[in-house]
Amino acid sequence: DFCLSRELGDVYKRQVREWTKPFHEAGIQTHMLDRALNGLRMSPVPADVRKLFYKVKHAQGTDITRTFCGLNDVRNIIPSIGYAHEAGMISQCSLCITFSPIHTVEYYVNMAKQLIEAGADEICIKDMAGIGRPVSLGKIVAGIKKIKNIPIQYHSHAGPGFNMASILEVCQAGCDYIDVGMEPLSWGTGHADLISVQAMLKDAGFKVPEINMEAYMKVRSMIQEFMDDFLGLYISPKNRLMNSLLIAPGLPGGMMGSLMADLETNLESINKYKAKRNLPFMTQDELLIKLFNEVAYVWPRVGYPPLVTPFSQYVKNLAMMNVMAMEKGKERWGMIADDIWDMILGKAGRLPGKLAPEIIEKAEREGRKFFDGNPQDNYPDQLEKYRKMMLEKQWDKGQDDEELFEYAMHPAQYEAYKSGKAKEDFLADVKKRREEKANATTPVEAENKTKVLTVDVNGQPYRVTVAYGAVDPATLTAASGAVPAQAAPAPVGEGKDVLSPLEGKFFLVKNAQETPKKVGEKVNKGDVICYVEAMKTYNAIRAEYDGTITAICANSGDTVSEDDVLMKIV
């Protein structure tokens, strides 16, 4: 809701209140999600911002907070219990379910016990990837009920195929609530459908409410309208499919949409490399299998973090960077983003398992320090800083400090919203996707479709056409012709090139706390000079030598390709 409202420039705070109002009138409580230390974002949040989060959302009409820590570190969850109670909300604390030698029934029951003792009002069994084994899940629920007869809610995704059996098992063990979905967003990477779950539980002897089919069909129709408008442009048709291949890597359904979108960019990067070296191209399916295999390799070596936001993205991104590196003749672990290092080093919480020696050795070689204290201590309060910034910019803090909260939680996105850039970029992206959809070819046509690539030959770029299958040479003339591509204007400034190691978006800073580098500024070897954001992770680009920045060759927010010149240093 935040992202869409901000990008469209809508008055999101009014939308949230209007959304919760009819639920309250019908006696239905509303939920929100809280990533504990990470709040609503992919990186840690100061304690004062976390506390304001609860105050704002309760004022907007939210009743229950579902808090989870992607590492299952109760130290990150317990503060949210207090924030919820102070705000007058119900605290539902989550157990992030995964399947490993560490994540046993006893592990989860003990975690629930700690949360209940800390004051949790409810427990959520968050089976985010749908890979929890049905019988084990039933045992977890039964074990928790022995501690205290506390409300338990089961959340799962249908993709791997365990979902319906798991729902039956947890209900037989005493689960009170089940998360369900509705067509056309149920099944696949979503929840099991309401109609199917209701029919199954009714047959099993449970007392379940009847479904108002007229209302169901109306809501289903509204969802389809949203998808036909523009929402469907961001949802891969493959998300509807069941896929038992998801059992091994354990990646959650919630990130499969972004994964498939990222995969297209990653595949393009790999095949550009292969085209320059006259190597066979890789298919998307081949890359997907390599990624799944690499996730299975990486996951235990970085301590078995439960694969839920943001750590599912971290593990997936690390695996993808390894795959891309190895496909390009490089070694594993060559590029690890700072956020991923924070997870590895313990700054985001305690990892469930042990790190592999190769990871520890790399950290020591790079002079990185491990941390075993309270993760929140690494992130001091910042609300006063944002209050001052809003005052300087003459921005209203909003009703119940809503605007202040959004700025402190999402500084870059908020500034893009205020400038109008977010809306402009969003509408341009929707237009582009609609055009691509309108021009989409059939599968048979796509198989024989030609691709135009830019190939570098002895420093000179040439546009060439790569054809698949039997293609009439006459059709290639316009596209290829051995005419050099028009070279980009040479960037101002002298010195050595700082090249982008991957495709993504260029940023000088990743948050408002950092000061952007400028032309003329001196830098030392190892200094962070900019970032390339890819796959929801900011990858720090460091100076490889001492010197002075003579040129910055991209603007913040620009899309850059691998080997694009980002800066020049002399």
Give each language-model segment a name.
Residues 17-26, 42-162:
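Hydrophobic, small-residue-rich alpha-helical packing segments that form membrane-like cores
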Residues 11, 258, 262, 281, ...:
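Active-site loops and adjacent core secondary-structure elements that bind or stabilize anionic groups
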Residues 489-570:
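Structured functional modules or segments
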Residues 165, 190, 198-201, 205-280:
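Core active-site phosphate/anionic-ligand binding loop and the adjoining beta-turn-alpha structural block
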Residues 67, 123, 174, 197, ...:
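Conserved, mostly hydrophobic/aromatic
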Residues 314-321, 326-519, 525:
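Flexible, low-complexity "carrier/transfer arms" centered on conserved reactive residues
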Residues 127, 173-190:
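Glycine-rich phosphate-binding active-site loops on the catalytic face of alpha/beta enzymes
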Residues 1-8, 12:
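Single conserved hydrophobic/aromatic residue that forms the stacking wall/gate
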